[in-house]
């Protein structure tokens, strides 16, 4: 899976887990520097968070992450200053938070001696951008080494987070838990009715004629004969009317409008399948009910893998949050820092030229 795709999803469990955007670059820059690059962004570069004695997160780290994300998703707009301006303004708060988390995860990976070999990083870069990285120098003032560091950081962060989340989730989701979850869904399904039906509209030049035709259609349908749209249409036309037939609807209780549900519940199914004639501005309406059944689930053995995946996804989101909270506590990061950095009265982190 490419890094661009993993910016939106992370594969911790061999399944899809939604996460934040993840790119980054580690560097060391003075807190008072000011830089301008070809991307049309004036960077008010300063330290945003100190991870340890050797590593700090700076404004430039976030900008470089935005540069790669923008080029990965919108390469056709790379020379559009207005598009870049809108994109950076909208994405800055999200990327600011995730880049700090990424630095913390990379520090944790280093402590745990979890590494990504350079070959894997280069393969990822080539899969994303090909071998020509010159657009980064032209539009973003980024060297190939900068790009390498960004991709390397995301891969390292993904690996350590995946390992930490997966190991805990695998311990939580047991066969017994899957069976309990299945029974819960089965009990809920037993309270749901599923409806299969169509809505017929009948028109005629005179109101009494329309009612007469609708009565014949209702009678024909309740005789028990099989559904035959062509024969019904011919019947209506022979009586001087018009017939319009909806598609076949398959709905559960919660998906039905109040009017449709009321009309369907009045049908004495299965003794009859066509309800009473209803007047409507667009013509006379007939509800034709083909089936009404209680919702059932497939056997457990057919659903077990799917249910296990759902449970793992739920626990993964919880464990991901727990893992990041522990990192915040370990490295002394207060999430309120993000709010302070984004406050209206806070010093600008970057300007759009």
UniProtKB/Swiss-Prot annotation:
It comes from the Bacteria. Keywords: Signal. Residues 1-24 form the signal peptide. InterPro entries: PPIase_dom_sf (IPR046357), Trigger_fact/SurA_dom_sf (IPR027304). The keyword Signal applies. GO terms for molecular function: peptidyl-prolyl cis-trans isomerase activity. Belongs to the chlamydial CPn_1058/CT_355/TC_0634 family. This is Uncharacterized protein CT_355. It comes from Chlamydia trachomatis serovar D (strain ATCC VR-885 / DSM 19411 / UW-3/Cx).
